[in-house]
Amino acid sequence: MAEREHDRIPYSVQVEFRTASSFLVAYSVNLSRGGLFVETDADLPTGVLLSFDLQVPGVGFLHLVGVIAWRRGLDSPDGPPGIGIEFQDLAPQLGSAIDKLVSLFRGVQILVLSGDRQDRTTLARSLKSIISTAEILQAADADAAASLLTSDIDLAVVDLDFDPEGALETLRRAQRLSPKVPTVALTASAQLREYARTAGADELATNPPPFGELQVVLVRALSKPVSVRSTATA
């Protein structure tokens, strides 16, 4: 019966997370509450069943079944396009995997690039207050950031206003890594926001960022999968 029910699921989504830490952030914010938002521009209808395969470093593949509860379109002012997925009781499917990942969790590494010492210190304190286990690495210029920016970094937060060219190059460098490092770009300039998008910034925030806005973009960037693929199965 279970196999026949699985055969009737019309859509399948495969989601690959960059690190175990990325998945744990997504779980703590979304999955533990019974849902998940996945960025995708695929035109999937609401109300249908979805086969959902998660690829997580450290535990391999996890299989879930959910329902597409809502969609956000390309032109929405509320954020990137995607689908909101609702799941039923997740404990049987994820319990042992979460226990294993939590036992191995050693926090996240966040690189902060800002040419202003006071701004850099204030930003580092705000990040620590949002994620207390985070290790904050600080860089005063793009050269220092380049020496610290490796695939071991979980997130780079980049101030564009002090040295725009150096900051944009840092965003591009993060994109070139394999796997790429997610980035949050901070700027008070509308033009620099567009440049940051072109350079590959995953999230944008005003500079200096209000605490609530920083919290939203930080969690969203940390929990963002490296790839999302959707296919029709029927």
List each language-model region with its residue ranges.
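Alpha4 helix (beta4-alpha4-beta5 surface) of REC/receiver domains from two-component response regulators
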Residues: 169, 188-205
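Short beta-strand-centered aromatic/proline hotspots
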Residues: 26, 63-73
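N-terminal helix initiation/capping motif
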Residues: 1-31, 96-138, 227-234
